[in-house]
A protein has these predicted regions:
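Catalytic cores of histone-lysine modification enzymes
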Residues: 1-58
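C-terminal SET catalytic tail plus cysteine-rich post-SET Zn-binding segment of SAM-dependent SET-domain
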Residues: 50-145
Length: 145
């Protein structure tokens, strides 16, 4: 638990000067601090969502890492909750199969049930905490720390 599983390659920025190319899809993009958009690369592009994830993404010393939330068995699929650090408007139906599956997923952290928001607070990236400080303070009633 807490072990780094992999580093994420954020080298492919998507912007006006570097748009998505043929075969590249916006659903494979990740949205970061200050509105930066990156195209996820394999293998992290293939990490699926779960409402009961076994990992999360955190930036440490400038590098985004996939970090284990618990022991992950050999051969077990690595998953994370796409709503952690999320602030989008996308909604989709989830078929993750987890006992606590939320069925309808809103890509924004703030659409999560309050108990799950509170559970995920320690997992939030520093940039997300900074950009969403007011909303997080409102959630906890005392701030994010």
């Amino acid at each position: 638990m807490g072990e780094s599983i992999m580093e994420i390659d954020d080298s492919r920025t998507v912007d006006g000067a570097h748009p998505l190319g043929p075969g590249q899809e916006s659903r494979h993009c990740d949205y970061l601090a200050g509105g930066k958009v990156v195209l996820m690369r394999p293998p992290e592009r293939h990490i699926n969502h779960s409402c009961d994830p076994n990992s999360y993404v955190k930036t440490i010393s400038g590098q985004r890492l996939v970090i284990a939330l618990r022991d992950i068995a050999e051969g077990e699929e690595i998953t994370y909750d796409y709503c952690i650090n999320g602030d989008g408007a996308t909604v989709w139906l989830c078929n993750c199969g987890a006992a606590r599956c939320r069925r309808e997923i809103h890509s924004s952290f703030f659409h999560l049930p309050i108990d799950i928001q509170l559970e995920y607070l320690p997992l939030l990236d520093d940039w997300f905490r900074g950009e969403k400080a007011a909303e997080l303070k409102s959630l906890t009633g005392q701030g994010t720390g």
